[in-house]
């Protein structure tokens, strides 16, 4: 699984200095009252926003339960927030994550699916990769026989710059195993994701 892990730890001092330089580059005075603490605040915000770079997302799936369950597990409407790696502006929306456990019947806690999505979203990211990384982690760590992940998100890089289309929603999906190979199963899980 390609996790795009960080090559070094977050350097808050360097990030603060870089934000100060950015303010100067756009024509602002970083020493005016309203901006005095902005570089440090932005650096702290980025430290949190990109925290997933410094974590192995598959660790959240290490705790499993042998339930003998061989049917669909689906968590819908998981809020996600990430940063577009092309423009470093947010994209946000919801993830729907479903899987059918492998023959072992091994399942993970429902909150772990949300944690996985959150951890992978907390890095410079593209929606397509995020969707695939979530699906691949479930196959890798749970040995799931079928996985479906759908993300619906609004990208501020499309809303506030360039084409300027606020409200446009991008939908991506990643299917693995039985959902990829069986059209009826895939149609069923997508119907459940849509809430029908």
Curated annotation (Swiss-Prot):
InterPro entries recorded for this chain?
A: GTP-CH-I_C/QueF, GTP-CH-I_N, GTP_CycHdrlase_I, GTP_CycHdrlase_I_CS, GTP_CycHdrlase_I_dom
Which biological process, per GO, is one annotated for this protein?
one-carbon metabolic process
What GO MF annotations does this protein's record show? GTP binding; GTP cyclohydrolase I activity; zinc ion binding
Is Membrane a UniProt keyword of this protein?
no
Coiled-coil annotation reads none
Keywords on this record? GTP-binding, Hydrolase, Metal-binding, Nucleotide-binding, One-carbon metabolism, Zinc
List the GO terms this entry assigns under cellular component, sorted alphabetically: cytoplasm
Q: Which Gene3D superfamilies match?
A: 1.10.286.10, 3.30.1130.10
Give the record's pathway: Cofactor biosynthesis; 7,8-dihydroneopterin triphosphate biosynthesis; 7,8-dihydroneopterin triphosphate from GTP: step 1/1
Keyword Transcription regulation among UniProt keywords: no
Question: Which reaction does this chain catalyze?
Answer: GTP + H2O = 7,8-dihydroneopterin 3'-triphosphate + formate + H(+)
Annotated binding of Zn(2+), by residue: 84, 87, 157
* Protein origin, superkingdom: Bacteria
EC assignment: the record states 3.5.4.16
Q: Which family does it belong to?
A: Belongs to the GTP cyclohydrolase I family.
Q: How does it assemble?
A: Toroid-shaped homodecamer, composed of two pentamers of five dimers.
Query: What is the name of the protein in this document?
Result: GTP cyclohydrolase 1
Q: Which organism is it from?
A: Corynebacterium glutamicum (strain R)
């Amino acid at each position: 699984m390609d996790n795009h892990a960080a090559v070094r730890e977050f350097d808050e001092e360097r990030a603060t200095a870089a934000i100060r330089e950015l303010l100067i580059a756009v024509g602002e005075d970083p020493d005016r009252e309203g901006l005095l603490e902005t570089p440090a605040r932005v650096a702290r915000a980025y430290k949190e926003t990109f925290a997933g770079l410094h974590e192995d997302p598959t660790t959240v799936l290490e705790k499993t339960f042998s339930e003998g369950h061989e049917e669909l597990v689906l968590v819908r409407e998981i809020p996600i927030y990430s940063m577009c790696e092309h423009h470093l502006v947010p994209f946000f929306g919801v993830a729907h994550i479903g899987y059918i456990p492998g023959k072992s019947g091994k399942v993970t806690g429902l909150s772990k699916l949300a944690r996985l999505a959150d951890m992978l979203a907390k890095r410079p990211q593209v929606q397509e990769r995020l969707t695939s990384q979530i699906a691949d982690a479930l196959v890798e760590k749970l040995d799931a026989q079928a996985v479906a992940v759908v993300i619906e998100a609004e990208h501020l890089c499309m809303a506030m710059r360039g084409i300027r289309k606020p409200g446009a929603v991008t939908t991506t999906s990643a299917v693995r195993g039985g959902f990829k190979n069986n059209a009826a199963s895939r149609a069923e899980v997508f119907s459940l994701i849509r809430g029908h």
